[in-house]
Design a protein with these regions (language model features):
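Charge-dense, helix-prone N-terminal extensions
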Residues: 1-105
Length: 105
């Protein structure tokens, strides 16, 4: 399944004007990197992948509709899968903010 171009466009618009953001096709989706660090992606499996502080992941899963991201049956610490909805801007900002806090690559 290809990523949802409408979601990708919404992400693109939310991150517009940030010169540190780069788009990169990967794993059937479209990733948005901040200073070379993945922040958020329009997933090839639908919805959104969001990078968060690994210490906050469990709390976010418990308090939101986010689910842990799994790759090959393993949960990926610091990554959440989210269905795109009205809260998309908050999730994109959460991913952008965390990726911005990491050292540039």
């Amino acid at each position: 399944m290809a990523y949802d171009e409408a979601i990708a466009q919404q992400i693109r618009e939310l991150l517009a004007g940030d010169a540190t953001v780069e788009e990169k096709k990967m794993f059937g989706g479209l990733g948005f990197l901040v200073n070379g660090n993945m922040a958020v992606a329009a997933s090839g499996q639908g919805g959104l992948l969001v990078r968060v502080d690994p210490t906050e992941g469990e709390k976010l899963v418990a308090s939101t509709k986010a689910e842990p991201m799994e790759m090959r049956g393993r949960q990926m610490a610091g990554w959440l899968r989210v269905e795109a909805g009205d809260d998309l801007p908050e999730w994109v900002e959460r991913g952008r903010s965390y990726a911005s806090s990491l050292p540039p690559k």
